[in-house]
Amino acid sequence: MELGSCFKTYEDFKECFSAYKKETRCSFIVRDCISVRFHNLNNGTSFREDILYVQVKFVCIRTQSNRKKTRKVDRCPAYLLLQYNETLDRLFISELNTQHIHADSNASGGIPASKPQAICLHKLPPVQLSIRKDLDTAEKPSVEPSFCLDKIHKPSNPEQEGISPSDMAKIAKVMKNFLTVDEGSMASFSVGTSQDLDRLSFQSSKMSDLFARFPETLLLHRVENSQGHILYAFLVENKERESRVVHFAVLKAETAPSVAKMLNIFTEFNSDWPKVKMVFVDPSFPHRAILQEIFPSARTLLSIYHTTRLLEKKLHQSSVNASFKRLMKEALREAVFVSSDASLKNLCEMSQVLLDEELFSFLQAHWFSCELLWYIHVRKGLHACNTYMDSLDIVTSKVSSLFREQRSLLDCILHFVDYIDFFNTKGLKSLPTNAPKLRRTRLPSTPPRPKKPFRICGGGDTRLPVEEVEETKADSAQSQLPQPQDQSSKAGMLDILHQSGSELAYKLCHNEWEVVQNSTHLVDEAGSSVAVQLLENSHQVSKDGCSCSCSFQQCYHLPCRHILALLHTSQQPVGEAMVCCRWQKKYQHLLDPNGELQDRGIIPNTDQPEKQGQNHMIRDLSRELANLLMQTEGPELEERCSTLRKIVDIWADPYQLPESSQQPVDFRDVGCLPFLWGKLEEADSPPLAEAMVHD
């Protein structure tokens, strides 16, 4: 390891760094880091993900030689700073201090202290958190602060739009169809005394499988729309620290009984609920006592994600100066992504200036000083913290935007049922505008999950027999998303453009309209203008970049926008294998400018009217053969073209051949005509021969 050493990927550095640690018999930990995903998300860059970090600092923390389970931290000034250089497109060691100072430095085998290559510029606070010995000591449920009490027994919004009996019937049909087409899915809703929807809970079979795989931690995300309806999304965390939705619940009013019923339904749907060890909630969640009662073996903790977003919101709304905002943003970033006692203490002191006394006291008691919370956060790995925060940003933004943009609760429910499995897609994938089919294929080796009957809860639970679900198959089309009322006006808009504009203008605008129809629209007012963002449907691109599931690539066999985006991310050029033969210059001699097979051996006699129809059929057949041939590649394409030419020459009228065709023409002999396109073994491949065409 030398100052200025460069590495193409993080794996290359890791291999060299491992050899260095083995040689010096010293251990290093990450003290400070900025991941590529975090940097790309916040700065709009597209750095390669295989470099893993834009900047990372390793400090020496060598383990004692007595091999005890506990580690003693040596206060050693040795460190290494690895940074990414965009110009070089390489990771390089920008700072290096090899001055190891240990209690047993003579036996450490490290580099002598008299040969430092750099000077330690500054001393960062230790990353280790002071963890209490007894982490299993249960905390008594605290009294909810006043900023949470306004959500307890909150009356329903008088401006809420009631659901008519016809809408209730539509919801019932949609949920029955949802249960029919997705075996293992579950749903339940209750109707109040006013015959209005009080609560709706549902989850797909994929969500059930996700919770069964990762039941240890549960996070509740709360969204409220303009009409006062409440949506709760239940999320779990997989081993890569990516958040996944496992349950949805919609409440007309957030009261203690409705929340208790919602949580009880979740436990009924998921038999692995006793495995939940921790439940993370928003700081404003007012029903912690109910949550503790239904999950008695789980600890209720404040979500790091939601508390961080709360502090960011408070900072944005405050009137403090720009310098303080910048310093607190940096302190918040260090506390979350480089957690340590010092960083948490610094953030706590700055938050005291920003927050009111009650909220600050609540966060100080349940977030800043919660050793179990930060111990778990650090234990799972600070390097994966970016993944955790980014995945929550993606999932919660999808859920919140879809729930808040709908005008009615009925439309909202219909959209969530249709898009239920699109919330757990990797990356920022859009929700398709067209209603997707809920039918799914199940592997033959996977047994179908036991089906729970659909329930409508009124004064008491009424269970519908499963046989009744079959009656709704004929009406399943009606239970899909209702067609927009202004569909005719949209079609009329295109008709007017077609009538008043040129053909080219209409075609170009129609292409844009197709993009709009296959996208999710994020529209927000930004001052005097409107910010519009289109999120297109996701498509599957092969790793070699030769194929994509989009219609453009399937039709033209050219690199589409999705393949080009993949190549741009990996900084690779377009390869020859990504372009179909019909677009390559070296195969253009096989086609004429009109895209038809070139064959100068036949000149149609247009003076004979009775043969004009035959000539048209020949042209059509020629175009079709050209399209079929150009779907093949390389030698196979040349072989098939040579075979077709040979057949045409045999069938051609000798009197119609021009003088130029009387000359010998070279063909590749591929065998007897009945087996012209058969695959021959290499040993049986015939030699090249000359075929003479005589008059």
Curated annotation (Swiss-Prot):
It comes from the Eukaryota. The keyword Zinc-finger applies. The keyword Cell membrane does not apply. Residues 475-489 have a biased composition (Low complexity). InterPro entries: Zinc_finger_SWIM (IPR052579), Znf_SWIM (IPR007527), ZSWIM1-3_helical (IPR048326), ZSWIM1-3_RNaseH-like (IPR048324), ZSWIM1/3_C (IPR045563), ZSWIM3_N (IPR048325). Keywords: Metal-binding, Zinc, Zinc-finger. One of its GO terms (molecular function) is zinc ion binding. A zinc finger (SWIM-type) spans 530-571. Residues 434-490 are annotated as: Disordered. Signal peptide: none annotated. This is Zinc finger SWIM domain-containing protein 3.
